[in-house]
From Swiss-Prot:
GO terms for biological process: gluconeogenesis; glycolytic process. Pfam families: PGK. Monomer. This is Phosphoglycerate kinase. The gene is pgk.
Length: 400
């Protein structure tokens, strides 16, 4: 971890600091924030800057606006929530690099906070545009990246902006350091037995991570929609369940590689099946060998939960990424929720990655019991895959 430039090593005294945060929070149709975990996660870095007499400019994206300003993607609500959490004013700019932002930034005094409007209202943000990055860099003498959730994206406020700062004036915030730490320790020195639990709908999104995890884990549990491609590769009849036909050979290859490495791989033994994904559809609990034709598995069944619980019993480290079923609908969420309970009961070091998985853990009431809940899905997967992330690379110390 010492190879990453850290905020605690910088001389911040009374400087203006630009912090790239990840305030990409879920909202309901009335634009109320339904989960403010990402906002709360940014507070230690913000407070540290304020304690050093800094003035602070915060920048983030929210959602994926198509072209320019859209009310539902405004960060105004985030500024209000942050103000409440910090118990101090957060000044809000109605644009990103326009006159409102510039005027408010130049009037900023020590101890004051300004939040810019959604970075993605500027089309240059996602294009990693250096002109936009240069404009953003004018907002701070110091650049801090605390947005792990976007570190796998080469965007203007994440990568291009770092070119405007030398090593004395840029660093990772506390949240980013914590994220990198957990991911690196997981890969390099997990306490064993190390069990990876991988779910979610698609094998394609997790293929590289599975290949990278196999030599490092002791056991691998595969659930969610992606399990059906593995079951199909073993010759099971999976009915209408989700299948990535073109990845059957890859699935077979992973199972074979697991066997060669002595890694035990566990797949669901039963499922909750329905004819369609709807609240009205009748459901059946069936073994994976007996999914009726025209029916699809939408969650793991009770026997799978029992099996996976036994597999986890002696775990010392658990990494979980991806739900066990289509948890958005109550009747198909039980497997994921029971999995969450089972992981918490292990008393192992438990690391949860990915937005959906974090939602499951929150819903199960287990969030406080997990060792660490990562704020980034794609980013944590890419770190596990062993990739260098565009947002982290410029924050590595030059000498190493």
């Amino acid at each position: 971890m010492s190879d990453i430039l850290s905020i605690s090593e910088l001389n911040l005294a009374k400087k203006r600091v630009f912090i790239r945060c990840d305030f990409n929070v879920p909202m309901d149709e009335f634009l109320n924030i339904t989960d403010d975990r990402r906002i709360r996660s940014a507070i230690p870095t913000i407070r540290y800057c304020l304690d050093n007499g800094c003035s602070v400019v915060l920048a983030s994206h929210l959602g994926r606006p198509k072209s320019g300003f859209e009310e539902k993607f405004s960060l105004k609500g985030v500024a209000k929530r942050l103000s409440r959490l910090l118990d101090r004013d957060v000044i809000f700019a109605n644009d990103v690099i326009g006159s409102d932002a510039q005027n408010k930034a130049s009037a900023l005094k020590s101890g004051e906070i300004l939040m810019l409007e959604n970075l993605r209202f500027e089309k240059g943000e996602t294009k990693n545009d250096e002109i936009l990055a240069g404009e953003l860099a004018k907002f701070g003498e110091i650049y801090i990246n605390d947005a792990f959730g976007v570190c796998h994206r080469a965007h203007a406020s994440v990568e291009a902006i770092t070119k405007f700062y030398d090593d004395e004036h840029k660093a990772a915030g506390f949240l980013l350091q914590k994220e990198i730490n957990f991911a690196q320790n997981l890969i390099k020195k997990p306490t064993r037995p190390f069990v990876a639990v991988v779910g979610g709908s698609k094998v394609s999104g997790k293929l590289q991570a599975l290949h990278n995890l196999l030599p490092r884990v002791d056991k691998l549990i595969i659930g969610g929609g992606m399990a059906f491609t593995f079951l199909k590769s073993l010759g099971e009849n999976i009915g209408n369940s989700l299948l990535e036909e073109e990845l059957i050979d890859d699935a077979r290859e992973i199972l074979k590689k697991g066997k060669e490495l002595g890694v035990k791989i566990y797949l669901p033994v039963d499922v909750v099946a329905a004819q369609s994904f709807s609240a009205e559809s009748a459901v059946k609990y069936v073994t994976v060998q007996e999914i009726p034709s025209g029916w699809m598995g939408l969650d793991i069944g009770p026997a799978s939960v029992r099996l996976f619980k036994e597999v986890l019993a002696d775990a010392q480290t658990v990494w979980w990424n991806g739900p066990m079923g289509v948890f958005e609908m109550d009747k198909f969420s039980k497997g994921s929720i029971k999995m969450s309970h089972a992981i918490v009961e292990t008393h192992a070091t438990t690391v949860v990655g990915g937005g959906d998985t974090a939602d499951v853990v929150e819903r199960a009431g287990d969030a406080d019991e997990m060792t660490f809940i990562s704020t980034g899905g794609g980013a944590s997967l890419e770190l596990i895959e062993g990739k260098e992330l565009p947002g982290i690379k410029p924050l590595r110390k030059a000498s190493e």
